[in-house]
């Protein structure tokens, strides 16, 4: 498996509760600024390596965004979760957190180019701009578990599956492929995949191909179609060496 060197990933299903929208504009602004200042301090103290959000095209109740957050240590991940839920801002959020390790199985490493680092937005991240999605791509988030009786996280594949998916990814210009394996597997999913395409049609076709039984992976799956959430802004949150 091709793994990131050490480190831990926080996977976060999040959103805002309805009670947030009953606050005044002044309260929202004050709570948001306090929250941003706190989170940026945690990011710097614990050497945040990545903060990437994906907004669901169709929210599922209070669950609106999926996040992948990388730290070099468990201590950083724990500190981030505590800070994110801290009041007053934290009272108005929806939180589901999972700890994971990232790494692709060898059979699919060549399906997508190595992702390059995103150029952060210029300016002070404490000054939050108007945030929006990046409409230049669609990211499929796939939650998957093996069939009954398999070891958690295992995914047996056939040669036919590898050949078919590899050809599809090349034809449709797969931009990025990542996998995260949960440290504590859930009843319905053991790992998460991110597959990014430039075209919505390609993302939709990838979902249908993964759902097919032809590759012999009788796995339980659920999918969410997303767009990257203000990627250049949040790239500016990562740890910076002090000069």
Where on the chain are the PLM-derived regions?
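Conserved short beta-strand edge segments in small beta-sheet-based binding/regulatory domains
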Residues: 89-103, 215-227
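Acidic-histidine catalytic/liganding microenvironments
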Residues: 45, 87, 213
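Conserved, mostly hydrophobic/aromatic
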Residues: 67
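Solvent-exposed loop/turn segments connecting transmembrane beta-strands
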Residues: 86-87, 186
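Short S/T/G/P-rich N-terminal loop/turn motif that feeds into the first structured element of a domain
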Residues: 1-63, 71-78, 100-190, 196-208, ...
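A contiguous, mid-protein "functional segment" used to position or interact
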Residues: 207-211, 218
